[in-house]
Amino acid sequence: MPKFKDVYAVLPVSEHSAAVAWYERWIGRRPDTEPMEGVAEWLIAGNAGIQVAHSPEAAGKSAVVIVVEDIDDTVGSLGARGVECGAIQDYDFIKLTEVADPAGNKVTFVWENPNYRPSTADD
């Protein structure tokens, strides 16, 4: 089995500059690297990152799920930066909210309930 080192979610965009500005706003910093023209990368957790890539033909057709420590704090922090999330959806085992980037790619923020216990046949 291969030993994986890093994971990047690639989000294709049609307007690279606008997308980079939008991601800078909610991530709170400039890209960590711009390895080539039309590509910007942010390391957002451990060895996981987001890559915004200029690719107009694929723009708006991707999605990424980001697990957060506090969904309410995340929504509040993003709102303070001008990034409005959808309503928080509560499914007992998770809470989530979604937002679309300027290209239409879906970014879903998820909080996992550490106290959730699924019902069993014995319940």
Enumerate the predicted regions with their spans.
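Vicinal oxygen chelate
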Residues: H16, V64-K106, W111-R117
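A short linear hydrophobic-aromatic micro-motif
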Residues: R30, I50-V52, E84-A87
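Short, charged/polar surface micro-motifs in flexible loops or helix N-caps
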Residues: G46-G49, E57-G60, D70-D73
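Short, charged/polar, Gly/Pro-enriched secondary-structure boundary elements
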Residues: N47-Q51, G104-V107
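Core segments of cupin and vicinal oxygen chelate
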Residues: K3-D6, V10-G49
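Short acidic/glycine-enriched loop/turn segments that link adjacent beta-strands
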Residues: M36-V39, A58-G60, Y91-K95
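Conserved catalytic-core motifs of GNAT/GCN5-like acyltransferases
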Residues: R30-M36, Q89, P114-Y116, T120
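N-terminal beta-strand motif that seeds the catalytic metal site of vicinal oxygen chelate
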Residues: M1-V20, S62-V64, N113-D123
